[in-house]
Amino acid sequence: MKLHIGPGNTYLPGWINVDIFSNVRADIYSSALALPYERETFELIYASHVLEHFSRHMILAALTHWRDLLSSGGILRLAVPDFEAVCLYYLRTRELKNIMGLLYGGQDNDLNVHKVSFDQYTLTEMLEKVGFNEIRKWSWQETDHANYDDYSQAYLPYMNKEEGMLMSLNLEAVK
């Protein structure tokens, strides 16, 4: 089975879609920190632009919970705003208004706030700390959900996938 945490407007058919917000399409409504599943239930867990919404003190707890839900050899596929790419974009363009959402979240409700930033080194270190291995970047074009637009495909200038810079750090790790 495959679990999609925080689908927002991107419901993935054939997956179990879990969101905390009842105003989006999901199969289950739950906190991502207390998912109602047995250990080793899933072969793949996907969370696109979810992890940055937890306080930095809860990141390892979230990663540990998700690891426990994976079967042996299962994959955790993450997408988070890429702090390094965001900084490079800002230094090249000085367009702060274009990166506000990536840095701070949409802020249209109390939960849509980014509380932590990630770069590849830091997220890799956290994944290793909770027992993941084979940590690698993944390409949104090469997944079974490539045709479903979500923030793993976030580019600046906005959605310029040919000439823009990818603003999402896409990492996956094996249990």
Predicted regions and their residues:
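S-adenosyl-L-methionine-dependent methyltransferase catalytic module, highlighting the catalytic core
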Residues: M58-S71, I75-V174
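Conserved SAM-binding loop
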Residues: K2-L88, Y121, L171-K175
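Short, flexible coil/turn micro-motifs enriched in small/turn-prone residues
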Residues: M1-L3, M100-G101
